[in-house]
Amino acid sequence: MPNAPPADPLAWRPLRAPSLEEMEVVAGEIFRRLPANFRAMCEDLVIQVDDFPTEEVLDLLGIESEFDLLGFFQGVGLPFRSESAAVQMPNMIWLYRRPILDYWAEHEEALGAIIVHVLVHEIGHHFGLSDEDMEAIEAQQSDQDGKR
């Protein structure tokens, strides 16, 4: 039975949630595995991992619980960019480690699959993609991972 808990309860000790740094590495690797044409459109996009969203972000979105937001796109999406606009901060995607881990603990999805979903969804906001487009990218990613 491969999913059975270890016979020794102390065997759980080395199991732990990924740190901020480890989750950044995972997010970077997931990004590198996304379809090349999709990644090519993400020039100058910064991916940042933090434990929780800031109070300002929660207030902006009208969200009460810091656990209700897994990721956030901050910047000007490509459909809304203007050549005449003043120089701005780079577009960023924030992944929120603790809410992602909480979601992971409550669902039967792999942590990597959750991060793929959040990352693709937030990048989708950057490009103004439809939900169907984002689902197709996730499916393509899943197919590629299945071939590895």
PLM regions: where:
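Catalytic glutamate of the conserved HExxH
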Residues: 118, 122-126
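Active-site rim/adjacent substrate-binding subdomains
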Residues: 1-114, 126, 130-136, 141-146
